[in-house]
A protein has these predicted regions:
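Non-catalytic, mostly N-terminal accessory regions of nucleic-acid modification and defense proteins
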Residues: 1-210, 277-288, 399-402, 426-433, ...
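Conserved Class I SAM-dependent methyltransferase catalytic core
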Residues: 29-42, 332-417, 708
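Short acidic (Asp/Glu) and glycine-rich catalytic loops that position anionic groups and cofactors
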Residues: 182, 244, 274-278, 323-329, ...
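Conserved S-adenosyl-L-methionine
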Residues: 188-299, 303-320, 343, 368-370, ...
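Feature representing long, continuous alpha-helical segments
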Residues: 233, 262, 299-301, 343-347, ...
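Extended hydrophobic-aromatic, low-complexity segments
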Residues: 307-310, 357-362, 373-376, 397-398, ...
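Flexible, glycine-/basic-rich loop-and-beta segments that form/coincide
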Residues: 406-507
Length: 725
């Protein structure tokens, strides 16, 4: 489409808002009028040439008592029609009744267009337009002879020929209007569509490698986050071009935003596609095509956006682990963080791949950097990457220039996924760094400040097709991105010693120690005799200080039985201390044996909980103490208790032996460490920028000094005088 003509149409439609809607609607509501009326004007322009035929055919159907209007499609030439007697042009013939006639005009549309009108919520605006008297002005503007929204050439008021507006060109107009309205309203500019050059790149990579495999027949193209349908349209256009129109392509999509869904549906109708192939609603919570599989899939799903609203449809209980908790089979592999659902869209596409055809399925999808590396081994994100890579479906990842999108300046990447790789690609993944392949824009569009030209797209496509390494193309084995996350444990080392302070701690129950200590400080030993007379004061203290205790803890705090039980435990500990003295024991294993022996000798009645309380009060971690033994196995192997505070993890690349790595990287520095093999888990991440990092050594002191003194010459020797002084 001619850029000048495109700009003229967009500017004219944009100006209608200020010319007609100012003071009638707030600026944020302009889009609610302009977008649906632009769609309707386009549909009207398409139907005008066959209007009389449709009216005649409809009259015949009425005469024959035939309610099914499907036959009208044959007369209109499109999968939609309008059986009212009005067009946009004829609505202006009766200015006094234009509002009533407009409603009749809208009612005359076929059911599929009625749904579009409904999704735009257009009828909600008609009363306001009527009261303000702007309906005629709006229709008049849209019928202006200076712009052409029809698919045919027309003459303007000067007799000049205005070029036809193709379906593709109309799509561009819609998307630019959406972008401008979003930008005007400080919304996500471009949230619902992708820059055309990025779609062009995606379609090149998607179709070029298999163009010779595409035969006569029908192929299905799918976008699970289709927005206004631009990606589907471009994909079909390029697919037809690259295959010399020898195959048919059917477009399928799903969109959650009602406005962009309406635009997409109207675009499909205009092109003769089935509007029912565009599903409305959330792809994640309500799959529009649960039983279909597709040949080609491409998408730019939302990233960094929560899927909380879809959660109930996907899982039974978010807190529970395991695939049995996941309702939707598309997502059985794993669930990403609730704050970012982009990888769920990828898994939705993966679930719809064809496995029983020669070509299989090909996917091109845009993600931000977090999809490459976010998530620990065993977590949802890592499990999704693991599933795709270990099935050998990931072909390539292409890093795009920053600020190439309208709504974000963060790094973005195209993933190419295929379940029928070429032989040369099997077991390998290609990374292409296209971050520097762009040309600056003269004026920013939202956050978009650059664009890819055809030369850049051709360069990337050639790199992909050649499958060779270069400065901006790297090829790695699948295993290169995987690692084993091992848990490194170190032994618990404890020392024990009876001290007056440690024994005194036992006076108070650990779970309510602070509250018991306050009560004892204020009421002393009387608490052991008659605590009831202090209950009111204790409760007043709790209320005043807003202390919230569990009912069971509050009961213990006010219980004489509990106070005396703690006193008995403290007194028992004192008897043990009298027996063992104040010696420090640095071998916990021997100490516990001695402690139990002493308790037995003193005939003390201490339960398991009480014994633990005593040990906890007199024991602390000491790196110089002996290791605490957990158990000794039959063969004599000693298993030590692990110190959770010293627990660490290491990521061992899959191509390295875990034990060799452990000896080299861990035992050399921490001789008493060991691996808890029960916790070893495999993960995958793609640290894209690391693979293309070029180390630049710092300049030498001599070089820097020479440069400084070279600059010093320009300052009349001042620096030299300072240095010499």
């Amino acid at each position: 489409m001619n850029q000048k003509v495109h700009n003229q149409i967009v500017s004219f439609i944009w100006s209608i808002a200020d010319d007609v809607l100012r003071d009638v609607f707030v600026r944020g509501k302009y889009r609610d009028i302009i977008l649906p009326f632009t769609v309707l004007r386009r549909l009207d322009a398409l139907l005008v040439p066959t209007k009389d035929k449709v009216l005649e055919a409809n009259a015949f159907l009425i005469q024959q008592n035939i309610d099914d209007k499907k036959a009208l499609e044959n007369q209109s030439g499109y999968p939609f029609w309008n059986i009212s007697r009005f067009t946009f042009e004829t609505l202006m013939n009766d200015a006094d009744n234009i509002d009533t006639n407009l409603e009749a005009y809208l009612d005359g549309y076929s059911p599929n267009v009625q749904e579009i009108i409904s999704k735009f919520k257009l009828r909600n605006q008609l009363e306001t337009m009527k009261e303000a008297g702007v309906t005629y002005l709006l229709i008049e503007k849209l019928c202006n002879k200076e712009i052409n929204l029809s698919p045919n050439e027309v003459k303007n008021s000067k007799g000049e020929t205005l070029p036809p507006l193709t379906n593709l060109g109309m799509g561009y107009v819609f998307e630019e209007l959406i972008r401008k309205f979003n930008e005007e309203n400080n919304e996500e500019a471009g949230e619902h569509f992708t820059p055309r050059e990025i779609i062009k790149l995606m379609t090149h990579i998607l179709f070029t490698p298999v163009k010779d495999k595409i035969k006569k027949g029908t192929y299905l193209i799918y976008d699970p986050a289709c927005g206004s349908g631009g990606m589907l349209t471009e994909a079909e256009h390029f697919a037809m071009e690259v295959t010399n129109n020898k195959a048919d392509f059917m477009l399928y999509g799903q969109e959650v935003n009602p406005e962009t869904y309406a635009i997409c549906t109207s675009d499909m109708l205009i092109k003769g596609e089935k509007s029912e192939n565009i599903a409305y609603g959330s792809t994640l919570s309500k799959d529009g095509f649960p039983h279909l599989h597709f040949d080609f899939m491409l998408s730019n799903p939302p990233y960094g956006k929560t899927w909380k609203i879809d959660e109930d449809a996907i899982v039974n209980d978010r807190g529970k682990k395991g695939s049995q908790n996941i309702k939707d089979n598309r997502f059985q592999i794993g669930l990403p963080s609730i704050s970012d659902g982009q990888l769920l869209f990828l898994m939705n596409m993966v679930s719809k791949m064809k496995h029983n055809t020669e070509m299989g399925s090909r996917i091109a999808t845009v993600h931000n950097g977090s999809a490459l590396f976010t998530g620990d081994a065993g977590g949802g994100e890592s499990e999704i990457r693991k599933y795709i890579i270990e099935n050998d479906w990931l072909e390539c990842i292409i890093a795009l220039p920053k600020n190439i999108f309208y709504n974000t300046g963060i790094p973005t990447y195209i993933w190419i996924v295929s379940n029928k790789k070429d032989t040369k690609r099997k077991g390998k993944v290609q990374l292409i760094n296209a971050m520097d392949l762009y040309e600056k824009l003269r004026k920013n569009l939202g956050q978009k400040n650059c664009e890819m030209k055809s030369v850049h797209i051709d360069t990337i496509t050639k790199l992909y097709m050649d499958f060779v390494e270069s400065d901006i193309s790297k090829i790695y084995t699948n295993e290169y991105f995987g690692y084993n996350k091992i848990t490194v444990e170190r032994p618990l080392r404890l020392s024990s010693k009876f001290t007056p302070e440690a024994i005194e701690i036992l006076r108070f129950d650990k779970s309510i120690a602070e509250e018991m200590e306050w009560a004892y400080t204020h009421f002393g030993n009387d608490l052991y005799k008659d605590i009831k007379k202090y209950n009111a004061k204790i409760e007043a203290y709790l209320n005043k200080n807003e202390v919230k205790l569990k009912p069971s803890d509050k009961s213990k705090l006010l219980s004489a039985l509990n106070w005396n039980k703690q006193l008995e435990l403290m007194q028992a500990a004192q008897k043990i201390a009298d027996k063992l003295g104040d010696k420090q024991f640095d071998d916990f294993n021997k100490f516990v044996h001695l402690l139990n022996k002493t308790i037995k000798e003193l005939k003390l009645n201490i339960d398991v909980k009480g014994l633990k309380s005593i040990i906890d009060s007199i024991t602390w971690k000491n790196e110089d103490a002996e290791r605490v033994i957990k158990k000794t196995e039959k063969g004599g192997t000693i298993i030590y208790e692990a110190d959770s505070d010293l627990r660490d993890t290491e990521n061992v690349p899959l191509d390295q032996d875990i034990q060799e790595y452990f000896v080299r990287e861990v035992l050399q520095h921490i001789p008493d460490a060991w691996i808890d093999e029960s916790k070893t888990v495999k993960g995958y991440e793609i640290s894209f920028t690391r693979y293309f990092y070029n180390y630049l050594p710092p300049r030498s002191i001599e070089e820097i000094t020479a440069e400084i003194f070279e600059l010093e010459k320009e300052t009349d020797g001042i620096l030299n005088e300072i240095v010499n002084d």
